[in-house]
Amino acid sequence: MKTRKSVKARKTVNAGKSTRSRKPRKAKPAGSVVALSNEQVTRVLKLLKGANSVELKFVVPATGHRATIAGIGLDPVEAQPRQAFFFDTPGLDLNKAGLIVRARRIQGGRADTVVKLRPVDPATIDPGLRRSGSFKVELDAMPGGFVCSASLKGTCTAQEVLDVTTGTTPLRSLFSKEQLAFYDAHAPAGIGMDSLVTLGPTFLLKAKHNPKNFDRRVIVEMWLYPDGSRILEVSTKSLPQEGFQVAAAFKAYLAES
């Protein structure tokens, strides 16, 4: 088993070598050559009718992280550090059921929470939930795939998250009554929220960028996992009726960056 220190040391040495001997190679977002089938397009159009927003996301291969950040023109120093905790059973029963329970600490003492279900069919969602200001239906689209999710968000303090993850207070205390009811309605039978274990934390850096050659905000997130692996995600959002047009423009923007 690799320790965090050994992984960091190995990556530091390798990074030093590559920086001096190689020019960063620009990499296309993973899966960028995969197009949706006619059947998938029809399905997306149906889902868009019930969605509040669309998130368009590309995952950049590890070989292209440095070049992508440089090409976008992002200053990594301006990225905001965050710490994400996921909650599930040891056997990941929530994940298998499509249910996500997460708390996220944000720089400055703030934090937020979410209970998310995916996939969902927007047509089957309770109209009462839709009236909540904390509830959102979003279509997550990536090259060659898509999924519709329903989520209830909440806020808390960073200290409250720490109190839960250290066992000082119960997990349910982080979430609102709406979130708890949503969890109870969709969790596998017999799995109460306070029986969940903490997974993580996962450290991430999030940066918001307003490019000159693209007419909307771009979000860049670098996820640094406990095992030493990294994922770089580049995303933007649009209204449902703009989804296909923004997707084409976003793809062109990334290709030129």
Q: What are the language-model segments listed below?
A:
Residues 2-4, 10, 17-257:
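Phosphate-end processing signature that detects enzymes handling 5′-triphosphorylated RNA
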